[in-house]
């Protein structure tokens, strides 16, 4: 059992018989009332985000989730095909299930696929990925004086803000949790 005092971002709980992930939470103490935990939770099957208030100390079941390492093979229409690294079985996952994680996945990349009751739910790419800049504006002399940023479109279609010195063709390290540029990778 998981208590509200153990809540943290990314924790998965079972609420009303369905798997949810905690996106954000805040412990709130109110005058002359019992404290509550104001929580944003994301339904792992549908991706819908709910805002719920739980009494402090309420307990939740831990969902029966299974994590498998799979390799991304290719896209086929509105689905993406992955291969189980142990059984070599191939599964097709609809684009809606993958969500924004698709911006961090390249061919042959190993990802974690979270299963709930035998059904693939969530794709979790590695925490950091290296992606190449497909297009960005050229840097001009004097741009770096202000230390600003510019948009850059990466090979997967993701657009991130990068420093002015980044050019088309550069390899960048990206944080998949925030979608932010971390550093330029030396090749």
Swiss-Prot record:
UniProt source species: Thermodesulfovibrio yellowstonii (strain ATCC 51303 / DSM 11347 / YP87)
Subcellular location: Cytoplasm
GO molecular function list: translation elongation factor activity
Pathway the protein acts in: Protein biosynthesis; polypeptide chain elongation
Record-linked PANTHER family: ELONGATION FACTOR P (PTHR30053), ELONGATION FACTOR P (EF-P) FAMILY PROTEIN (PTHR30053:SF12)
UniProt gene name: efp
InterPro entries named among the record's database cross-references: Elong-fact-P_C, NA-bd_OB-fold, Rib_uL2_dom2, Transl_elong_fac_P/YeiP, Transl_elong_KOW-like, Transl_elong_P/YeiP_cen, Transl_elong_P/YeiP_CS, Transl_elongation_fac_P
Name the record gives this protein: Elongation factor P
GO cellular component: cytoplasm
